[in-house]
Amino acid sequence: MALTDTQVYVALVIALLPAVLAFRLSTELYK
């Protein structure tokens, strides 16, 4: 099962979104 470029990018976005949100939340809390 080969991944297409689109599937790879979608998976990256899905993985990165929670990480970015958590990072922004932590920076807000620890200001």
Swiss-Prot record:
It holds the Pfam family PsaM. GO terms for cellular component: photosystem I; plasma membrane-derived thylakoid membrane. Keywords: Membrane, Photosynthesis, Photosystem I, Thylakoid, Transmembrane, Transmembrane helix. The keyword Cytoplasm does not apply. Its main location: membrane. The chain crosses the membrane at residues 7-26. InterPro entries: PSI_PsaM, PSI_PsaM_sf. It is a single-pass membrane protein. One of its GO terms (biological process) is photosynthesis. It comes from the Bacteria. Coiled coil: none annotated. It is found in: Cellular thylakoid membrane. SUPFAM superfamilies: Subunit XII of photosystem I reaction centre, PsaM. This is Photosystem I reaction center subunit XII. It comes from Thermosynechococcus vestitus (strain NIES-2133 / IAM M-273 / BP-1). The lineage of its organism: Bacteria, Bacillati, Cyanobacteriota, Cyanophyceae, Acaryochloridales.
